[in-house]
């Protein structure tokens, strides 16, 4: 009997440990009362991805320009959202690639100015403004690892970095230049580039931190205008619901994971652990 009890205890501890580690790096709370309009030329958005079908973009046109509150000075560039509509009872996954600074609807706390491709999933264009939408954040199902590009005009003494192809948004970018032993955090601009004004000739290290606190490192041999590099890693999205997959990165289609309101994998494991503890308690009573 003692052996069985010990086995159950170890099982519970194992599942509780797994549950604790598998947490989504951002809040997935369901937000209601959102609205949406549409615009017809989504390329060259404020997040710096240029042509959406090009090497910096998501590879499709299911995108949105965010109002100032959601855009948050560029901090939500590259964030993906699952938006649901009462007009069609459908949802669509989009990536934030632009800002919507116009007065009016864009000034609302939760407003999306969508591409026509995304808008059409949620309602007819003749409606004009969609009201009563709900949304939550989801990881972007990008292919490959996180990438980095140095801005046009970069030189040995100044550069700026665009971080793209990430499943989650970026919290911080730091640089360790030649001859230094510590990293220096950079400032993110409202157009989504991280500015590094104190470079020197030679190689340097870049440290990229996700909103979940994970780090990716890359060594770059020299500053070179518009030079692109792929890192060796991608950020984890364990514990997130609605993680999209596939060649399109899940954009334009409903999320493939659990719906909001159902347990994520981590929550399910927690419930399983509690169930195991209940069994342990019953065994000890006997």
Swiss-Prot record:
Keyword Signal: yes
Extracellular side stretches: 22-265
Entry keywords, A to Z: Disulfide bond, Glycoprotein, Membrane, Signal, Transmembrane, Transmembrane helix
SUPFAM superfamilies: Barwin-like endoglucanases, PHL pollen allergen
Presence of keyword Protein biosynthesis: no
Assigned GO CC terms: membrane
Entry function: May serve to lubricate the movement of the cellulose microfibrils during cell growth and wall extension and/or they may serve to maintain the fluid state of the slug cell wall.
Homology family: Belongs to the expansin family. Expansin A subfamily.
Protein name (record): Expansin-like protein 1
Species: Dictyostelium discoideum (Social amoeba)
């Amino acid at each position: 009997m003692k052996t069985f009890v010990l086995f159950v205890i170890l099982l519970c501890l194992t599942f509780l440990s797994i549950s604790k580690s598998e947490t989504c790096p951002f809040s997935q709370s369901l937000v209601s009362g959102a609205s949406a309009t549409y615009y017809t030329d989504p390329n060259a958005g404020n997040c710096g991805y240029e042509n959406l079908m090009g090497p910096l973009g998501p590879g499709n046109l299911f995108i949105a320009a965010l109002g100032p509150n959601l855009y948050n000075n560029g901090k939500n560039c590259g964030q993906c959202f699952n938006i649901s509509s009462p007009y069609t009872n459908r949802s669509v996954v989009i990536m934030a690639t632009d800002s919507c600074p116009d007065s009016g609807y864009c000034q609302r706390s939760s407003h999306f100015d969508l591409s026509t491709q995304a808008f059409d999933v949620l309602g007819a264009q003749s409606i004009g403004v969609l009201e009563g939408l709900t949304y939550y954040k989801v990881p972007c199902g990008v292919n490959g690892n996180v990438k980095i590009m140095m801005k046009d005009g970069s030189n040995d003494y100044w550069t700026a970095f665009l971080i793209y192809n990430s499943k989650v948004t970026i919290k911080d970018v730091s640089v360790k230049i030649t001859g230094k032993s510590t990293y220096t955090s950079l400032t993110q601009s409202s157009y989504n580039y991280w500015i590094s004004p104190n470079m020197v000739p030679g190689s340097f290290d870049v440290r990229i931190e996700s909103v979940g606190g994970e780090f990716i490192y890359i060594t770059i041999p020299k500053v070179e205008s518009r030079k692109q590099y792929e890192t060796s890693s991608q950020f984890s999205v364990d514990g997130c619901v609605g993680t999209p997959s596939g060649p399109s990165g899940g954009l334009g289609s409903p999320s493939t994971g659990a719906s909001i309101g159902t347990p994520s994998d981590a929550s399910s494991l927690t419930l399983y652990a509690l169930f195991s503890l209940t069994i342990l308690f019953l065994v000890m009573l006997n």
